[in-house]
Amino acid sequence: MDELPEIIIETLKKRGVTELRPPQKLSIEKGLMRGKNLVVSSPTSSGKTLIAEIAMVKHFENRGKTLYIVPLKSLASEKFNSFKERYGEHGLKTALSIGDFDKQDKFLDSYDLIITTSEKTDSLIRHNASFFRNVSCVVIDEVHLLNDNSRGPTLEILITILRQMLPSAQFIALSATIKNDELLSKWL
């Protein structure tokens, strides 16, 4: 665990975590902290969120922003509360942007971590939100929704646009149930 950012080590100690789980170790081996794009497919409660946290803290230390995309407002609120509690004392400013789809949300420029839904991200892109110029990490939680008939095409287009807008950003896709993770990994 010595290679982890100090903020992560402190946070894990407070939570009583003394060692990483296999998916977390594998993600580090595959380049998590070197900015490599990753698809993390592992069971529920196996530590996928911590993988995203390690990346977002690493980007925070390098003055980059992380865009954390979730499918539901309730999940966005849950992540917001959790991350704010864990990392607020370390100076990482967390924002929740799930509301009005007809504005730019300029306030997001002053935040390090922006948690939002796919639909709100789409709106922020269409309104040319200025914070995007500093996004260096994009986390897509529940990426298996790409296989969903109703939400999948929209999510696929959103990821494609983000990859074009942010060609040097690190993309991390998280799922417990994705079936075609190797194909998705090649695409990212």
Range-by-range predicted roles:
Residues 1-11:
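Conserved ASCE P-loop NTPase core motifs with emphasis on AAA+ ATPases
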Residues 9-11, 15-188:
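Conserved P-loop/Walker A NTP-binding site and adjacent catalytic elements of P-loop NTPases
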